[in-house]
Amino acid sequence: MKWSNVNSNDSEVVKQSLVVSKSCGASQQTSDITVQVGPAGTIKATKDSSTAIQNLASYMTNAASCGTTILLSKAGDSVAALYAGADVYQSDVGPYLLNFKKQFKAGSQIIQSCDSSSKRDNTIGVYIVNSLDDLEGIDRALQTWSKGSCLDSDGHDLIQSKTTMLGVSEVSKRSDISSSLEGFLAPRAEDNFDKYNTGTDLCKNLKVKQRVCCSAGSLPDIIPKKQSDGTCGTYTIQTNDNCAEIAAHFGVTQDDIYDLNEDTWGWAGCGTNDLKADQVICLSEGNTPMPSPLSNAVCGPQMPDEFCTESPARTKAPGAFQSGKNGCISNCGTYIVNNDDAPENFYHVAYFEVFNLKRECLNMDVNEISDTSLTHVHFAFAGLTADFDVSFDNDEYKAQFEKFVKNDASYKRILSFGGWAESTSASTFQRYRDAVKSGNREKFAKNIKAFFEKYDGLDGIDFDWEYPGATDIPGVPAGSDSDDDNYLGFLKLMKSTIGDKSLSIALPASYWYLKTFPIAKMSDYVSYFIYMTYDLHGQWDYNNAYADVGCPSGDCLRSHVNKTETINSLAMITKAGVPASKIFVGVSSYGRSFGMVDPTCTGPMCKYGGAFDVSTAEAGSCTNTSGYISNAELNLIMQGVDSGASNYKGRTWYDEDSASDVMIYGTKGEITTWVAYMSDDTKEARIDWIKGLNFGGVTDWAIDLQELNLGVDPDSDEAQDLDLPALPTGCSSANWPDNLEDLRNKIDKIDLGCRAQAVVWVLIKILPDILDNYQSAADNYDEYFKYYAEWVRNGIDDSLPLFMWSDGQNYMDCKWSSTSDGSGDAACTEMHVPEGQPGQGEVSITYTVRDEDGFYKALQADYGIEKDWIVWKDIYADPENSLTCPPCPNLTKDCKPCTGHGVTYHNWPVKAADDDIDVPNLKDIIDTAVPNITTLQDVILGSFIEMRIGAMDASDEDVATALSMPVFMIADTTEQMKNITKIGKEQEKADDEAKVSFILDIVSIVLMIIPFAGEAVDAIGGVANVARAAYVVGEAGNAALSVYDIVKNPSSAPFAILGLVMGADASVVGKASKTTFTKAAAFRNALTEDTLSSFSKEFRANDAIVQDIVKACKRA
């Protein structure tokens, strides 16, 4: 476009020309797009980040550049990066960004419109970091977008939007071919192209490597054909291949590729990073191909040279093979087999970890097992003595077992032996190797038989020897080649010994450990196998090149309950000759967790840290093991996140690829940990799937990890002592209100035993908003204190005469003279002289402080005035002309007596100069209280968790009573802070009543938060110094002084309660003391009605709701 051809006097023409120039000469079209928005709360300084986005939007709105745009904008500490692809109408990016103001203000880090399968460069991406220290994240995001890929969007929200795209004017990999060909081909060539290629919309859908005609005729049939042996037509993936280009090159569609490869080895789809170099895929109908061999594979279809390869001898005789070959082996393919018939019954096993009692919390008594869906419960674990008899670690575990076999349960009661710890401990591992040997197994079997006779309620035994024949368990000598045969012989003898009692063993889902088990033969003697299809991945994968597909270093984030890998494991065991009906497939009630190297990277190629035996994952508060965390703990962490608890961060999502749930979390202010697990819904879906495959049942590790329990036998004396029978075994918070008013109105719908917990739940829900409002209000208080200090100083002159005409005279001597009534010299209380009377004549009074210590103490106590705040001067007062001749501050030539009937006061106290009066800045107390309020938030959440898991050694009612008082105090303070009107310059003319009210409000606020401020109060002279302003400007009985009466004693209820609960370390689950909350509740309960009346109406109303609820609970 040339401006010489534009009529610059025509504004519409100029405007249209500018629009065309901004589109770089290309056509424009409005496109519907899907925008992926990252989770809220990732970015902290949302005000700064929003400003950075506004700057980017402003620049882009006024930009007229062509091609790809990459911009960075910094505001405060936040840095925002923008990527806008070459096919995006750049000037429309600004308004597009402003559509997401709400998401940016909420703290979203990533917003991207991105399609990695598109051939156009139409990505719009924004990536924000909290500081310059995090620029690596921006670099990674920009590189990803510039390569045509997209950032991981797991857990992102999807929002439909619109923006303007361009038709580009040059051919490129990502260009729109239909518009690019115009002008690219010479007119004659373009005519020929259309002549030889007549397909509808061909240009619009052209792909790289797609074949077209350059002459008359038709294209050859290039679709691969089925091979002569029935194998499909294959293609070997090359580096940087993608499905779109492969489909175009071979004349098929991407949908065809998906359909043809549903059963192909290693097929993961067409997504980013899904195709692997050297992977073999199908491009036609036919049998699935053999995968490419791996030189280091020792089994399976990728083992070099042989899998399902026929190699008959030259004679072709049956069973005769070429030298060194095995022929077509029996386990060809990757399908689950031996599952044609459904079992007679589908069973549901759960393990009970008796060692849960060693945990500091999340305890469960064996009599708390109440799941009616269970058909078997395995009591884990018993051990072996040196002479092959049954043992328990301690008397407590044995007592639990004896209750287990005596209870009247609907499920089968099975005792499990071994486990990982006993199988690998230096003191016990050899016992399992020896017990199954031919010389010992009979003795062991007899001992087991005697054990059954002693405990006739026992229905079976289960052996969890981990693992016979294993050679790589750290700290354990390599197993013997005879372990497998010994184990088989032992099982054969054990089955004949125990008769119709149940016999089962646990099997690993790993080929390396399973290969030593003669499982096909074992299946003749066991009732079922416990197949541990959990722990498929864990910290032990670290630095293992064979642990994670596509992850040579073994340190990639992978799910330990991955469904695809579970399928492979099930194929492995069924192909080994075990009928599906005898296999109980593992599901889990815990997660395997990893410390993330990059908390923003959550996909299967992202890395975790640590070492083979060192996990950097955040440990659960009860299981207390990095890398392993219970579902119950994960649920509690998300409760903390959902309730806005300080330092709790996290989010969850369902991962389709692994068919498992994923959570990232951190409880110390930052997300640090990735964990894969099964939620209840996921577990139910997995169980239904397993049942549909005709397996015999499922086995769940472990029932005590699922949810919170009391950890006490409901029928025991201990339960009676703790008054536990009245408590329900679980309090669901799903429908609890999140404010006190609704809680009071709906309290009848909540079980009595759960109501105190519901109170604490409400405290958790309301405290974040209280804290936010407190901090917001506190931001304006620097301005407020300027007026506060000024008005306190101005009140001194009003208060001094009141003191001098009352208690002040008790500490002074007077010398006086009067023209009408003589003179004298005595204590001021005995002075007789006319003052303030018409016609009195001239009066002169000189004051001398007799008891200086008593004078200043009384002045401070009664009126809050410090010694340094006054000076002693001579002043004059005229009673006859007070309206026109006010009292003179001193006798100077500028202030002469107005009449002959005044009074001269010598050595009279007056306000010192403003600069000499240091009014404490109470803002310091307001600011200092914030960290302690935040800590209180953590304490309440920690206490709630203890209540939920049954680790709180105190009554729920005492906990609710103790925690509510400090919350209501800070809530009351916040409301007062919000209600103080911002003081502007016009308020300098406020009347005296308004000024006094303002000062008293501020003093009341600060006094109420003093229990939260700690040493900051001492820095300004203590509580009395805070209250001083109320004495200077107020009067006895004002509201501020009533609050002062509450908090002036360090042992009063607010101080005592806060000190107890803040010192309880309740933010660490299991650490709270029963006496802590009992004592704190006692301080609240000891408050009299008179004392309570000193608190605000709102405080008393909230407190009354809590008291009514907890008293009803105690009466029940």
From Swiss-Prot:
> One Pfam family, short name please?
LysM
Q: Which SMART domains match?
A: Glyco_18, LysM
**Which ranges carry the GH18 domain?**
346-719
Record family assignment: Belongs to the glycosyl hydrolase 18 family. Chitinase class V subfamily.
- Tell me the superkingdom of the source: Eukaryota
Function per UniProt? Probable chitinase involved in the degradation of chitin, a component of the cell walls of fungi and exoskeletal elements of some animals (including worms and arthropods). Might be involved in manipulation of host defenses for successful infection.
Q: Name one GO biological process term.
A: chitin catabolic process
SUPFAM superfamilies with a match to the protein in the record: (Trans)glycosidases, Chitinase insertion domain, LysM domain
State its Enzyme Commission number(s).
3.2.1.14
Q: Which reactions does this protein catalyse?
A: Random endo-hydrolysis of N-acetyl-beta-D-glucosaminide (1->4)-beta-linkages in chitin and chitodextrins
Q: Which PROSITE patterns match?
A: GH18_1 (PS01095), GH18_2 (PS51910), LYSM (PS51782)
List the keywords (alphabetical).
Carbohydrate metabolism, Chitin degradation, Chitin-binding, Glycosidase, Hydrolase, Polysaccharide degradation, Virulence
According to UniProt, the name of this protein is: Probable chitinase LysM11
* Effect of inactivating the gene: Leads to enhanced fungal virulence, with faster decaying on infected fruits.
Domain topic, free-text comment: The LysM (lysin motif) domains are small globular domains involved in binding chitin in eukaryotes. LysM11 contains one LysM domain.
Coiled-coil region list? none
GO MF annotation terms: chitin binding; endochitinase activity
Gene name, please?
LysM11
Domain LysM: residue ranges: 233-283
Remaining remarks: In plants, chitin acts as a microbe-associated molecular pattern (MAMP) that is recognized by lysin motif (LysM)-containing plant cell surface-localized pattern recognition receptors (PRRs) that activate a plethora of downstream immune responses.
Positions binding chitin in this chain are Y467, W701
